[in-house]
């Protein structure tokens, strides 16, 4: 058959989404796993790895996957009980009364806009967050109720603070609000943090800091703690509690990353308040979308030589777009090459 339709069922009756795809190249796949004459039958995995057709198979899978991303959902049109949809940059959020159904799509955002769609990215983000939510609930409770699908999380509703808490351990970044960008322009006090002269890009800070932002016209706007309180965005007690939890989460994330050969460079947290007044962690935790990760083993030498650290986050995509266009001002952006995705 030239095409098939894959149905992903949310367990518990939450919903159904359909993704159509066209898996070309079945001959190459079949050839890759068929043993030659005189060869003993090996496992499917070994046959694929050792096959002379391996590269053909990988290319078929890659090309098929790129055209079959989960870029849009409309569950509110078909699932009873979902009364409305809010489309975020990456997540489609459905109102289900006392709960929210959050579908993490494959959309890739940066510079406050959508850049591309990346196969299986939504699943990676959702399952990464769930892993961290489970391991950080001793630091702060979270809103997660269940995960009926690899791309879906059901969460408790709460009153969301209109402030994002960005925790940073290094002077780095390429966006307009990144610490290196503002530092390189001469800022020495950023979001209430006093920074010394003489720092260079990708240098480690003497201690972790918070650089809160708030939303204005779909853009992140840096704010100081005093501005947050004066503008009524948070009470002083809520801000102090949340900022303490954010730094504790970041320190724990850095510790776990270090144990796995990584550096958690910076990240973003969002919090809300439950009906009982308790603070809850929401949205996502320590994902490659909300965080920067570097390879720890190569960082010292690359830093000394003035090279960009090896990263496993979306910084490579940011850098590509920055070198090929103005992602903040250009109305139409170039398509990212398939090899990059």
Swiss-Prot record:
Pfam families reported in the protein's UniProt record: SAICAR_synt
The protein's enzyme class: ligase
EC numbers for this chain: 6.3.2.6
Main location: plastid
Reactions catalysed according to its record: 5-amino-1-(5-phospho-D-ribosyl)imidazole-4-carboxylate + L-aspartate + ATP = (2S)-2-[5-amino-1-(5-phospho-beta-D-ribosyl)imidazole-4-carboxamido]succinate + ADP + phosphate + 2 H(+)
Keyword annotations of the record: ATP-binding, Chloroplast, Ligase, Nucleotide-binding, Plastid, Purine biosynthesis, Transit peptide
GO cellular component entries: chloroplast stroma
Keyword Plastid carried by entry: yes
GO biological process, one term: 'de novo' IMP biosynthetic process
GO MF, one example: phosphoribosylaminoimidazolesuccinocarboxamide synthase activity
Pathway given in the UniProt record: Purine metabolism; IMP biosynthesis via de novo pathway; 5-amino-1-(5-phospho-D-ribosyl)imidazole-4-carboxamide from 5-amino-1-(5-phospho-D-ribosyl)imidazole-4-carboxylate: step 1/2
Record CDD domains: SAICAR_synt_Sc (cd01414)
Subcellular location: Plastid, Chloroplast
Family affiliation: Belongs to the SAICAR synthetase family.
Protein's UniProt name: Phosphoribosylaminoimidazole-succinocarboxamide synthase, chloroplastic
Native species: Vigna aconitifolia (Moth bean)
Lineage, uppermost ranks: Eukaryota, Viridiplantae, Streptophyta, Embryophyta, Tracheophyta
